[in-house]
Regions:
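Terminal substrate-recognition subdomain of acyl/acetyltransferases
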Residues: 1-59, 114-118, 125-130, 149-222
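Conserved beta-hairpin
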Residues: 71-86
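Conserved acyl-donor/pantetheine-binding loop and adjacent beta-alpha core of acyl/acetyltransferases
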Residues: 88-121
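Amphipathic alpha-helical scaffolding segments
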Residues: 88-94, 140-145, 163-164
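Short secondary-structure capping micro-motifs at structural edges
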Residues: 61-64, 73, 106-114, 143-146
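Conserved acetyl-CoA-binding loop-helix of GNAT-fold acetyltransferases
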Residues: 132-148
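GNAT/GCN5-related N-acetyltransferase fold signature
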Residues: 77, 89-91, 127
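A short helix-loop-beta-strand connector motif used in the catalytic cores of GNAT acetyltransferases and
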Residues: 64-75, 94-99
Length: 222
């Protein structure tokens, strides 16, 4: 297994790998290389090139606009050099995210209080249909949270999901909270749902909540 560092500001160096040894040992046991980069255009090309049965969603418009490399990152898992899983995250406040979401996806929105301090939004989770059921996506999500908290120094990581995936986000991705965010009549929210999906939730964890879950989440890596 190798760490591939193609990011201008954030890297997976030896000290960082040792800090999260159990997590990286899992990737090594699966013969996976882990890449961090800041090429969001390539990420879009990877996801939009997939057939509907491999990636069912439109690309998340949050990652369409210009992104400063210092405020976000892309993660890939590679198997025999093929990209087999993705994730992305960027610094963004909840009010800004919701304001932008309302412009693209009109609907009935709940009021959710802003998070204290800097927050990070994450999306674009995908695992190749040929490699699902191996815990790769779940463990990559955990690495993404660690990077948001450790390297980007965020206090909260949040994501949105369709209502059917609430259990997955809370009990498998180990977010500490999930609240209903909006009813979107047209559905089809990029990175989160298809046309049939009308109800969307926000899942989130603070850095303290994530630290308190470490004993629990590390059992996934064995």
């Amino acid at each position: 297994m190798a760490q591939i560092n193609n990011h201008e500001f954030y890297g997976l160096d030896t000290a960082y790998v040792e800090k999260h040894k159990e997590l990286f040992d899992f990737f090594e046991s699966q013969n996976l290389d882990v890449e961090i980069n800041d090429d969001f255009t390539e990420l879009k090309n990877v996801l939009t090139s997939k057939d509907k049965d491999d990636y069912a969603y439109k690309f998340d418009p949050t990652f369409e606009s210009y992104l400063d490399s210092a405020t976000g990152f892309v993660l890939y898992l590679r198997y025999n050099n093929e990209i087999v899983a993705t994730y992305a995250a960027k610094k963004q406040s909840l009010p800004t995210f919701v304001k932008d979401m309302k412009l693209v996806y009109p609907g009935n929105y709940e009021t959710i209080d802003d998070f204290p301090g800097q927050s990070a939004y994450s999306s674009c989770q995908w695992v190749s249909k040929n490699h699902r059921g191996k815990k790769w996506g779940r463990v990559l999500d955990h690495l993404k949270k660690n990077l948001c908290f450790d390297l980007m120094k965020c206090n909260t990581n949040f994501a949105i999901h369709k209502s059917d995936l609430r259990d997955y986000h809370v009990n498998h991705l180990a977010y500490s909270n999930s609240k209903r965010l909006a009813i979107i009549p047209n559905g089809d929210v990029g990175g989160a749902g298809e046309v049939i999906d009308k109800e969307y939730w926000i899942a989130y964890s603070s850095v303290t909540e994530w630290a308190d879950k470490q004993s629990e989440v590390k059992t996934l890596y064995t």
